[in-house]
Amino acid sequence: MFKFFQKILHQKKPSGSTCSLPDGIDYHCHILPGVDDGFQDPEKSLEQLRIYEASGIREVWFTPHIMEDVPNEPEELRWVFEDFKEKYLQDFARRHPECQASGAEGAKQSTATDAQPLLLHLAAENMLDALFERRLKAGNLLPLAEKYLLVETSIFAPPMNFRGLLERIKNKGYTPILAHPERYLYMKKEDYEALKAQGILFQRNLYSLRGQYGERVQKRCRQLLKWQMYDFVGTDLHRLTSAGLASS
């Protein structure tokens, strides 16, 4: 998984893909039901995954919030994830009886169809707060592909010793991925440049470019795209939608 994740850093959209996500992978969403401020109803979560299938998305990272206000325990999230993944695979099997879904990541054997279940993974979106620092010290984290940590800050101000904390993350063997940097309007170009020089990866929210978070964030997103600073794209979905997932 780690080597695969390294490869997709520079992977282009698959030929013939109808998905608006560059590599058919959503690296950031809140679809796992009932664990944060995202989806609450498992049926709505299943409906969203069906929309993902139809949109050409092929892989999804569930990244529920972990922060002092939402102190999710990794082990509890793993239990919820495994239970929901089983529900999804059962739902897929009912919709595609010609396929035999099997395996921990939804691998399948197909006879007369190209239908494939989504590959589902669990990580977390970590607020850089005191809870995170304690869990970083204890090694109690949910990384993407073993070595990448999706992190965020307040949209109003960075944490104290922000870059020092990022360096401590790296010293623990992780590469930080900063979620939606376009939303941190306290940052200036030199701040972004310093983070990139530090080896921090950037994840763009799909809907930032479409104005979902306001004109200032949209403008900042365009600037970061122009500066070629983004490494990943995620939806950051919290509610059911089909808008903008398939390429026009």
Where are the regions that the model predicts?
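Histidine/acidic-residue-rich catalytic or RNA/ligand-binding cores of hydrolases
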Residues: K188-L195, Y213-R222, W227, L240-S248
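His/Asp/Glu-enriched short active-site or ligand-binding loop at hydrolase and phosphoryl-transfer sites
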Residues: L201-G211
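An N-terminally biased module of ancient metal coordination in phosphate/nucleic-acid-related enzymes
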Residues: M1-R95, C99, G106, S110-A115
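Short acidic/histidine-rich active-site segments
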Residues: H65, Y230-L245
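A structural motif
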Residues: I57, M229-Y230
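Extended substrate/RNA-proximal surfaces in nucleic-acid metabolism proteins
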Residues: F2, P71-C99, G103-F202
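Conserved, mostly hydrophobic/aromatic
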Residues: H28, H180, D236
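Non-catalytic positions within long, well-ordered alpha-helices that form the structural scaffold/packing
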Residues: E53, K170, L225-K226
